[in-house]
A protein has these predicted regions:
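Two-component/phosphorelay signaling modules centered on CheY-like receiver
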Residues: 10-31, 96
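Active-site beta3 strand of CheY-like receiver
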Residues: 46-52
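Active-site residues of response regulator receiver
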Residues: 54, 82
Length: 120
């Protein structure tokens, strides 16, 4: 399985990747992108099976990225891993087709719980 991690912070991309492994999902191929615009190109080239995206990023936000994926006809399971979680954000994410919104800080157990339905 290939997982795309999208975050403008390199450190956060590494934390998310490490937490995926700590949650028991070792051996999966993890690819990265710095923002939604770059992530769209990675999706086309790498064809990930799951996308984990930050919400607030320069150039193209996470919700704009999700909207662009939908507009281009991609049907890839998508979840947000972001620093805040308001009711409005959760509603917007759900309406856009996101499967979950995991707010930072999160634990390996939190990651295992949300990814369990998507990652074997």
């Amino acid at each position: 399985m290939k997982i795309l991690v999208v975050d403008d912070s390199r450190a956060m991309r590494r934390i998310v990747s490490r937490t995926i492994r700590q949650a028991g999902f070792e051996g999966h191929d993890i690819v990265e992108a710095e923002n939604g615009r770059e992530a769209l190109e990675v999706v086309k080239a790498e064809k990930p099976d799951l996308i984990l995206s930050d919400w607030h990023m320069p150039e193209m936000t996470g919700i704009e990225f999700l909207t662009a994926l939908n507009a281009e006809g991609f049907e890839i399971p998508f979840g947000f891993v972001t620093s805040e979680s308001t009711k409005e954000m959760v509603d917007q994410a759900t309406e856009g087709g996101a499967m979950f919104l995991l707010a930072k800080p999160f634990t390996a157990e939190d990651m295992a719980q949300v990814l369990g339905a998507f990652v074997s």
